Amino acid sequence: MVKYGLCCISNVLTEQRKLKFSIMRYNQYCKLGHDAALPIIAERTENNLLVTEQIIKLCASKGWTYRVSSCLFPLLTYKHAKFEYHDMPNWVKLDEIFLRIANFVCDNNVRISCHPDQFNVLASNNPDVVDRTVIELEHHGWMMDKLGGDRSHNTPINIHPATSKGDPADISKRFYEAFQRCSPRVQSRLVVE
């Protein structure tokens, strides 16, 4: 049986309801300064969660799966931006939206997944890349928990091996060692494509 799904955005919702994701680039953040940028990031994050909620409802109405956008949280995992989820002034409201989405996902049996960006390489021979990848994967695991996804391959975090440097046995060893650094919320969901 073929199962349809939606990847990140819905052109229909964008056209009909003007619902679209909002981002902030690091250069904008720097121009504004941290104190001015943080409320804007918080507002855009709230918008992104509300758009996600509407897309998930659309997917549920059609029996589709949904691949969650990796851009819900502008700059949250970017090390130079230096802020945490709970630093956003509206984090309590964000938690309420997350809970609403999680309840909907569970009540309607909506299958969700995510696919962190291609720069995430667990088998890299560059320790900085592996460190950043683990941070990104942990963020995605946290996000999938908040969205109500179960900790299984039914709610996958999908990545590519994305390296060809070295002997296949060495690549496998590096991947396994980096995988061991990940928490259960990542390990239980990680799928390699």
Name every feature range the model reports, one short phrase each.
Residues 1-111, 120-131, 146-149:
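Alpha/beta catalytic barrel-like cores
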Residues 90-193:
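Active-site acidic/histidine proton-transfer and metal-coordination neighborhood
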